[in-house]
């Protein structure tokens, strides 16, 4: 008899069983997991599935128990738990060949990024719901040359503003999609406000949330593909959703990005966009980054300056609206967090260096002893 129950991830032994089970399927049990369930036969784990927010993930069934309707049981369990948590719509990732399986369970395919991944969804708060909301805010955009920029702005800098100015000089309208995923040191609500304040004097610029479909936990799945394929899967899926669903619905003809000479993820993302957009008739413009003297303006440079109390550098890199925010209570709390995280990194680096030095000393002593 097969029974199902929650797997308590706070129990190391329970979690270890799930990790080992998923490893057998080439799945990595990492990331923002809030709930995991298991199917058991005579005490043996034979199937599992998890929730990370509204995303269903890490669904796997032991080979000898497949084709017995157990996938339906896992999905039913995860949907029930989602409803208990107030989640009215789910998303799921799978490999392209598995799309028909989940379509038979009522999921609709959002996009497929061959040969890596597919995103499906069911319930409310779907991509169409998101696009309907955004269209009501923006208007149709018909007859206009409409461009788009996706920004995280952690925080908003003069470099971001320069990118918007460049886009506006080349388009009738510019839509800024603010990355909604709250994994940055500056909270989404604060970043969204900083962007709006930073461009409020620019006619033809509108700021909207990127929702669950632009650089989010939904479009950047990090858990079911190992090795070098992971980054290609993430970037290609995100670019495909934008090119095939978002851009056509909002009459976007061009997307602008800032030049990124060194960050591996951003370089891969830009390359994926260049490839996918060219196949879908969307222009892709890479804009050189702005410098102040010999220093490139970047959000990471601003965060470093905040950690170092380097107000001279900060004033050179951010607009007055961002500078004013730094003096607010919300801004001060974020700055304290930045300083704390910077201090922790310093201590960790020091500890690592000391361990390496001690290890080298032991090795040197051992060599002397052998002689």
What name fits each language-model region?
Residues 34-47:
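Conserved beta-hairpin
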Residues 56-67:
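A short, internal acetyl-CoA/4′-phosphopantetheine-binding micro-motif in the GNAT/acyltransferase core
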Residues 1-29, 40:
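Short amphipathic alpha-helix that is part of the acyltransferase structural core
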Residues 49-51, 108:
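Short hydrophobic beta-strand motif reused across regulatory alpha/beta modules
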Residues 94-107, 112-371:
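Nucleotidyltransferase catalytic core that binds NTPs
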């Amino acid at each position: 008899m097969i029974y199902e129950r929650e797997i308590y991830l706070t129990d190391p032994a329970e979690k270890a069983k799930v990790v080992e089970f998923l490893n057998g399927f080439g799945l990595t049990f990492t990331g923002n997991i809030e709930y995991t369930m298991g199917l058991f036969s005579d005490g043996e784990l034979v199937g599992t599935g998890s929730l990370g927010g509204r995303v269903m993930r890490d669904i796997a069934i032991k080979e000898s128990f497949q084709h017995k309707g157990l996938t339906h049981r896992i999905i039913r369990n995860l949907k029930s738990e989602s409803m208990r948590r107030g989640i009215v719509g789910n998303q799921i990732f799978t490999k392209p060949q598995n799309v028909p399986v989940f379509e038979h369970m009522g999921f609709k395919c959002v996009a497929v990024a061959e040969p890596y991944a597919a995103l499906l969804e069911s319930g409310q708060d779907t991509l169409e719901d998101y696009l309907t909301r955004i269209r009501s805010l923006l208007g149709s955009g018909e007859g206009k040359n409409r461009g788009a920029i996706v920004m995280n702005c952690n925080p908003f800098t003069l470099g971001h503003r320069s990118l918007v100015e460049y886009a506006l000089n080349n388009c009738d309208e510019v839509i800024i999609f603010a990355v909604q995923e709250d994994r940055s040191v500056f909270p989404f609500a604060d970043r969204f406000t900083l962007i709006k304040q930073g461009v409020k004097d620019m006619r033809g610029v509108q700021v909207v949330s990127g929702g669950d479909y632009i650089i989010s936990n939904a479009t950047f799945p990090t858990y079911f593909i190992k090795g070098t394929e992971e980054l290609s899967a993430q970037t290609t899926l995100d670019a495909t959703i934008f090119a095939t669903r978002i851009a056509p619905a909002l009459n976007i003809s061009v997307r602008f990005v800032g030049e990124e000479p060194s960050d591996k993820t951003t370089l891969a993302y830009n390359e994926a966009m260049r490839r996918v957009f060219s196949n879908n008739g969307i222009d892709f413009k890479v804009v050189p980054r702005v410098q102040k003297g010999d220093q490139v303006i970047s959000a990471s440079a601003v965060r470093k300056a905040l950690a170092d109390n380097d107000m001279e550098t900060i004033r050179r890199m951010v607009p007055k609206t961002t500078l004013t925010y730094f003096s607010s209570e919300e801004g001060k709390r974020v700055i304290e967090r930045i300083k704390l995280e910077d201090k922790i990194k310093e201590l960790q680096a020091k500890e690592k260096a000391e361990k390496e030095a001690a290890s080298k000393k032991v090795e040197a002593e051992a060599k002397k002893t052998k002689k």
